[in-house]
Amino acid sequence: MSTHNTKEEFEQAMQKCRELFVKKLHDYGVAWRIMRPETMTDQLYIKAARIRSLQIKGCSKIDEGIVPEFIGIVNYSIIALIQLELGVANTEDISNDKATELYDAQAKKALELMLMKNHDYDEAWRCLLYTS
């Protein structure tokens, strides 16, 4: 059995997700603050449906690959958690810096939860197929 540094792997993956989040903040600001929970679940569904489509078809007309879709799922999930915590706003009511701070706090909570779950489940998730 190979050994994994799950915490390090998580942090590396989250760094890629965070970089894109910050880039999008620079481009669009916190426009997502007006999104209701239903909008967030729709965005997650769209990403999951695209992943499934790419896996089934094995090709796409827009060659972006599957990794950006997984990054999108992570980022939309964190945005949804922020929205649930703050509530929906009618305007862009927080700064980009505050949004990044909230993003980091949710990512930290996710890491802590994953590490606790891994203790209890012995990283059983590593045996799952990513296509499931």
Residue ranges and their predicted role:
Residues 44, 70-81:
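Short, structured motif recognition centered on aromatic/hydrophobic residues
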Residues 53-68:
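A cross-kingdom feature marking solvent-exposed beta-strand/loop segments within repeated
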Residues 40-50, 76, 106:
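Amphipathic, well-ordered alpha-helical segments in soluble domains
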Residues 91-94:
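Charged interaction scaffolds used for protein-protein
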Residues 130-131:
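Conserved small/polar residues in nucleotide/adenosyl-binding loops
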Residues 49, 53-56, 78-86, 112-115, ...:
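Charged/polar positions within long, soluble alpha-helices
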Residues 34, 38, 64-71:
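An alpha-helix initiation/capping motif
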Residues 1-40, 98-126:
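Extended low-complexity intrinsically disordered regions
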